[in-house]
Regions:
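Acidic-histidine catalytic/liganding microenvironments
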Residues: 296, 515, 543-544
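Extracellular/periplasmic envelope-modification machinery, especially enzymes
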Residues: 231, 257, 324-331, 342, ...
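Periplasmic/luminal catalytic loop of GT-C fold multi-pass membrane glycosyltransferases
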Residues: 488-491, 501-515
């Protein structure tokens, strides 16, 4: 097959470095990169651009697309590093963390066969709120989307090429498909619900890949292969102005958005995709500043290993940062962890990815086919890696077969069973004719406190649910208000599952009104929004005179034993402590409520007594 005219572009490796570093910062919960998850969007646009460019050049050269060869190349590029990673993580979790092993078991097959995103969707597994420790393979959702694109897109291109589709028609088709995908994301997104469905979906993420594909048609990198002449001044400034502006826009999106921002799903990811496309268009031009800046050796070095960095960073971070750790991790410790991630990715690149890419598997197959002499020689020459691979495989298989599921994970079934999973809360029981003494509306953190809360506050009510957002609190409260059962004390234990804004919190508090005693329980969760949410809750207590803070964050500090493996949900001991904390915080208001109830009951009994005495006197007079 004639070789394509595709060229290596170092600056695109630099852009890969930006993308993978953004993702790592996001998973490190860096407060200044809450939108680091957009690094995946950068990868999508890059993949769409490069893969489509290769397929276009192959069609131009051969008037066909060798699908088998294309898919084999993709498999050679992706699968060996994945298999090596899986073996290593299985070994590490078998030896050191059985909870993570339990979590990753059901994800291994979906990850190997690139359908993990749909596995998470149909299993209702959230990307943003993992009950228990997250699976070390959660991040494979993006690889699944890319591989699904690699499977389908060449077929579509080949069919359109054979139908003699013009370049203009190609571009129109791609734009329509991308628009449908972006519209699906906007329409399916529900601000009050977990956004994982639109975050994981191939249908709702395809537009990023398609924008890259569109760019490959209108701005192919091959057209700049021979360009060395200096650009006119105006063209130079226009080109670089666009690239720098797009870069600033992308950085702002990383810095000021997060996984729960409605803007992100209603145009933000689309905007990030367009910014990435502009940056690619500028970076592939050899005379641009981005081309030179992103071609810096450190960035290129990181970019070449970005695939390995992406594979390794998430499981290693989970292993090195237990989510139930409530202490502070020093910057030096984070640097050490980053160095370990880089070392693993570099090892994978040097000894797994590159050798396979350069025919190591083919050489091994040739050795086997050569017979009994060549194979022993081959194995003897590679005795250390063969022994290591065998040992890893034995330990990994042993862990899968013999390590039982952890009890911590099993306890989560109880959370789901106790959680209110209905869209609206159930109606109050028929015997409730007066207001509840206290009403608590919470998320999954307070689910385990339900039996203790009901025992502590027999005249109260608790409504807690998994994946509940703060913005849903208004609807839940109004339901109880309309039922006429809201007393004077209302507790909100929300803010675990996503960012909380001053506006949303004020709307909730204003809905309740100034005539209630409101308590806000702050949060402890190993997520990027923890610090900001707690600050937002603290500010609300200063703006509203009837609002009091219940400081769970401080009470739980340095008490790793309070939490299940996810560092968020409570153990049985902690559920009792959590309930006692609420009891202590609300004691004065509860005393007033109970005193008033006692007085009302005494008055009622006195009224009954007076009425009864009057009836008796009336009967005696009649006699």
């Amino acid at each position: 097959m004639p070789r394509s005219r595709s060229r290596y572009i170092p600056s695109l490796d630099g852009l890969r470095a930006f993308a993978v570093l953004a993702v790592i910062l996001y998973h490190l919960n860096a407060n200044w990169a809450p939108g680091g998850l957009l690094g995946v969007t950068v990868f999508f646009v890059l993949s769409g651009y490069l893969i489509t460019g290769l397929l276009i050049e192959e069609w131009k050269s051969t008037k066909t697309i060798d699908l088998k060869n294309f898919w084999l190349r993709r498999a050679r590029r992706l699968v060996p590093a994945i298999v090596f990673l899986l073996l290593c993580i299985l070994v590490l979790t078998t030896l050191f963390n059985h909870e993570l092993l339990t979590k990753m078991r059901p994800d291994i097959i979906p990850s190997l066969f690139f359908y993990s995103n749909w596995h998470y969707i149909f299993s209702n597994l959230s990307y943003f709120d993992a009950l228990g420790a997250p699976s070390p393979l959660t991040h494979f959702w993006s690889l699944a989307i890319e591989e699904q694109f690699y499977l389908v897109w060449p077929l579509i291109l080949l069919a359109l090429f054979k139908a003699r589709t013009t370049k203009k028609a190609f571009c129109r088709i791609i734009i329509v498909l991308a628009a449908i995908s972006a519209l699906a994301m906007a329409l399916l997104f529900d601000p009050a619900a977990d956004p994982s469905r639109v975050y994981y979906g191939t249908d709702t993420r395809a537009f990023s890949l398609l924008i890259g594909a569109w760019l490959a048609f209108v701005w192919p990198s091959t057209q700049f292969a021979q360009q060395s002449a200096k650009l006119p001044r105006k063209t130079f400034f226009a080109l670089n102005g666009c690239g720098i502006g797009a870069g600033i826009g992308l950085i702002c999106l990383v810095a000021f958005t997060n996984g729960f921002s409605p803007f992100l799903y209603r145009g933000g990811i689309l905007l990030a995709s367009l910014c990435t496309a502009v940056m690619i268009a500028v970076a592939v031009h050899p005379q641009s500043l981005l081309s030179k800046g992103f071609a810096a050796r450190p960035l290129v070095w990181v970019g070449k290993r970005s695939y390995g960095l992406y594979l390794w960073h998430y499981p290693l971070l989970l292993l090195m940062n237990p989510r139930n750790y409530t202490g502070e991790t020093s910057p030096l410790m984070y640097l050490a962890q980053f160095a370990i991630i880089v070392a693993c990715a570099a090892f994978s690149y040097r000894f797994i990815e590159n050798p396979v890419r350069h025919g190591a598997i083919g050489k091994f197959i040739k050795a086997v086919r050569a017979g009994s002499i060549a194979l022993p020689i081959y194995l003897r020459q590679h005795s250390v890696p063969v022994f290591a691979a065998t040992l890893l495989t034995v330990i990994a298989i042993g862990g899968l077969i013999f390590v039982p599921p952890t009890a911590a994970i099993g306890g989560l079934d109880e959370l789901k069973a106790n959680s209110n999973t209905q869209a609206t809360p159930p109606p109050p029981p028929p015997e409730v004719t007066n207001a509840y003494d206290i009403l608590l509306i919470g998320d999954s953190v307070s689910v385990r406190t339900i039996p203790y809360f009901e025992e502590t506050f027999p005249g109260g009510a608790i409504d807690s649910a998994i994946n509940r957002q703060l913005v849903a609190g208004t609807q839940i409260y109004n339901h109880y208000k309309d039922a006429g059962v809201v007393g004077t004390i209302v507790v909100f234990a929300l803010g675990t599952n996503g960012p909380v804004t001053d506006e949303d919190l004020d709307e909730l508090l204003n809905t309740v009104g100034a005539d209630k005693s409101i308590y806000l329980v702050n949060t402890r969760c190993p997520d990027s929004w923890e610090e900001a949410n707690n600050a937002t809750i603290a500010r609300a207590t200063q703006r509203h005179g009837n609002v009091t803070l219940i400081d769970w964050f401080s009470l739980s500090a340095n008490h790793d034993e309070y939490f299940d493996g996810d560092g968020t949900h409570l153990t049985e001991e902690a559920a009792q402590i959590y309930t006692a904390m609420i009891q202590q915080a609300t004691a004065e208001d509860m005393k007033v409520v109970l005193d008033n109830k006692a007085k009302a009951e005494a008055a009622r009994q006195e009224a009954y007594s007076v009425a009864d005495q009057a009836a008796q006197e009336k009967e005696q007079a009649a006699a």
